[in-house]
């Protein structure tokens, strides 16, 4: 929203009024969720197909207002090939007093990893390239002290050239309801986050990458649990039951009691589970799908694993600038979050145009 204010036009889409700058044409709805609706559009200024997201009721409560600020701050910070970044942010409002709507513009990504897995079992080389890119993006996100928390195939966008971007990071705060039953929101979640075992760290995302990688190699969901308990049973069938030292570290009395009540199971031999897979892939999976999060491989370590030998380049796996998230602990009023958000909209500077993208 920098420079002079553009000319806006209004149209109704899915019973919602959209008011956007004239540069964005041919808006067509592509989906909506709890936090907003998304239209595909053509950006006449760059020649790119873009996704425009209109946040729904961004300032209706303190929770909403803080979430809006969080999403904008995160997207503005992310500048990496394998992470979705912000192309534009705008509001039709001419002043803070009028400010009520926020629109975010990102690249329009064709397919997600779900579409790709459904269509075919991937070659080992495809799996290497896709997982390498996820880890390259995660190394960047984690270096800014951000945890994705909700990595799953539908949050990984892939284009025709197999180039991948991570979507929707750092925002996920799922309700219990959304995590209940036979749902993909939970199948990729690390056990410690799913069951509130203990304070979790960035390696919750590595667990998810392990689940995704196993699915790419086999064509099937690794742990398609019907509920929390069934999911834990499926996980432990593979990893074995947690050792005593790990159980003792769990602050939750209920979690400790429940796990101590389970029949002891040994860890399975991963080579017998992933028959026919590249032995290096199996070795990496064993380092990702570890119950003890302190012993799980990190994104930076995983990039240096022999499985990615043909892609790994330590000089081209960048880290992020420091990200100040001290706002997370602040208790502010709606109007204060709104004012901070308005400042972020106004101060936005669009990224330099990528020649390759404009030609594609």
Swiss-Prot record:
Reactions this protein catalyses: L-seryl-[protein] + ATP = O-phospho-L-seryl-[protein] + ADP + H(+); L-threonyl-[protein] + ATP = O-phospho-L-threonyl-[protein] + ADP + H(+)
Modified residues (Phosphoserine): 2
Main EC class the enzyme belongs to: transferase
InterPro entries in UniProt: Kinase-like_dom_sf, MAP_kinase, MAP_kinase_CS, MAPK14, MAPK_p38-like, Prot_kinase_dom, Protein_kinase_ATP_BS
Keywords, ordered alphabetically: Acetylation, Apoptosis, ATP-binding, Cytoplasm, Kinase, Nucleotide-binding, Nucleus, Phosphoprotein, Serine/threonine-protein kinase, Stress response, Transcription, Transcription regulation, Transferase, Ubl conjugation
Major subcellular location class: cytoplasm
SMART domains per UniProt: S_TKc
N6-acetyllysine modifications at: 53, 152
Localization, UniProt: Cytoplasm; Nucleus
E.C. code: 2.7.11.24
GO process terms (BP): apoptotic process; cellular response to stress; intracellular signal transduction; p38MAPK cascade; positive regulation of myoblast differentiation; positive regulation of myoblast fusion; positive regulation of myotube differentiation; regulation of transcription by RNA polymerase II
Stored Pfam families: Pkinase (PF00069)
Family that this chain belongs to: Belongs to the protein kinase superfamily. CMGC Ser/Thr protein kinase family. MAP kinase subfamily.
Subunit composition and interactions: Component of a signaling complex containing at least AKAP13, PKN1, MAPK14, ZAK and MAP2K3. Within this complex, AKAP13 interacts directly with PKN1, which in turn recruits MAPK14, MAP2K3 and ZAK. Binds to a kinase interaction motif within the protein tyrosine phosphatase, PTPRR. This interaction retains MAPK14 in the cytoplasm and prevents nuclear accumulation. Interacts with SPAG9 and GADD45A. Interacts with CDC25B, CDC25C, DUSP1, DUSP10, DUSP16, NP60, SUPT20H and TAB1. Interacts with casein kinase II subunits CSNK2A1 and CSNK2B. Interacts with PPM1D.
The protein, known as: Mitogen-activated protein kinase 14
């Amino acid at each position: 929203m920098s420079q002079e204010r553009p000319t806006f036009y209004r149209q109704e889409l899915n019973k919602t009024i959209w008011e956007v700058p004239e540069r964005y044409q041919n808006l067509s709805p592509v989906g909506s969720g709890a936090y907003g609706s998304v239209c595909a559009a053509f950006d006449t200024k760059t020649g790119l197909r873009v996704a425009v997201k209109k946040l729904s009721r961004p300032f209706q409560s303190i929770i909403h207002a803080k979430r809006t600020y969080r999403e904008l701050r995160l997207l503005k910070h992310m500048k990496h090939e394998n992470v979705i970044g912000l192309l534009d942010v705008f509001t039709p409002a001419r002043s803070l007093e009028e400010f009520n709507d926020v629109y975010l513009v990102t690249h329009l990504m064709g397919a997600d990893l779900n579409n790709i897995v459904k269509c075919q079992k991937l070659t080992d080389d495809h799996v290497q390239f896709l997982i390498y890119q996820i880890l390259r993006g995660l190394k960047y996100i984690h270096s800014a002290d951000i945890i994705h928390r909700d990595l799953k195939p539908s949050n990984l966008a892939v284009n025709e050239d197999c180039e991948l971007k991570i979507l929707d990071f750092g925002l996920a705060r799922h309700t219990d309801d959304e995590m209940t039953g036979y749902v993909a929101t939970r199948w990729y979640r690390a056990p410690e986050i799913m069951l509130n075992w203990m304070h979790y760290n960035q390696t919750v995302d590595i667990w998810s990458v392990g689940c995704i990688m196993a699915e790419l190699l086999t064509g099937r969901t690794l742990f398609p649990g019907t509920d929390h308990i069934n999911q834990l049973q499926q996980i432990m069938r593979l990893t074995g039951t947690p050792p005593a030292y790990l159980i003792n570290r769990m602050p939750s009395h209920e979690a400790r009691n429940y796990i101590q009540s389970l029949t002891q199971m040994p860890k399975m031999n991963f080579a017998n589970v992933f028959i026919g897979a590249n032995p290096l892939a199996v070795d990496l999976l064993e380092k990702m799908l570890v119950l003890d999060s302190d012993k799980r491989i990190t994104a930076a370590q995983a990039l240096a694993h022999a499985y990615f030998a043909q892609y790994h380049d330590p000089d081209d796996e960048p880290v992020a600038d420091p990200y100040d998230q001290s706002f997370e602990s602040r208790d502010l009023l709606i109007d204060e979050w709104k004012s901070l958000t308005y400042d972020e909209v106004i101060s936005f500077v669009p990224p330099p145009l990528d020649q390759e993208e404009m030609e594609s």
